[in-house]
Amino acid sequence: MIEIKHLCKSFGDKEVLKDISAVFENGKTNLIIGQSGSGKTVLVKNLVGLLEPTSGEVLYDGRNFVTMTKQEKVMMRREMGMIFQSAALFDSLSVLENVMFPLDMFSSMNLKERIHRAQECLDRVNLIDAQKKYPDEISGGMQKRVAIA
């Protein structure tokens, strides 16, 4: 569960978030909507730890993100993800290679294990048949599912 309490975020004199409180329960889908420039992205970046609040708290299962050790933050971030408005895929890599990219960079798996893991992820989002295609060959919705995988 993620809970935010009295969250405020400012950039210099500009207050972007003011006294926001909310609870995001595990297993539930939440929607954050608002006008352009209303602070949605700043809020989400605070939720996933890409920004730290000016004041207030962001709690993960009751633990304050700001007071976590670097290792605790790394472990917490492994449990969450964020998909940007554009899917942020590499145009020069196939769907499979895009999914494998973080494994290539940050895991000690061998090539066979990385391919297998990436194919499992693609299967979960019903894109196993698109693994050899490139981002410009699939729909925007499919690109988002690649980003999820």
Model-derived features with residue positions:
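Conserved ABC ATPase "signature" region
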Residues: 63-64, 111-129
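Conserved ABC transporter NBD signature motif
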Residues: 56-64
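Helix-to-loop junction immediately C-terminal to a conserved catalytic motif
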Residues: 48
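The feature captures the beta-strand-to-loop junction immediately N-terminal to the Walker
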Residues: 33-35
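ABC ATPase NBD coupling module
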Residues: 65-81, 105, 111-112
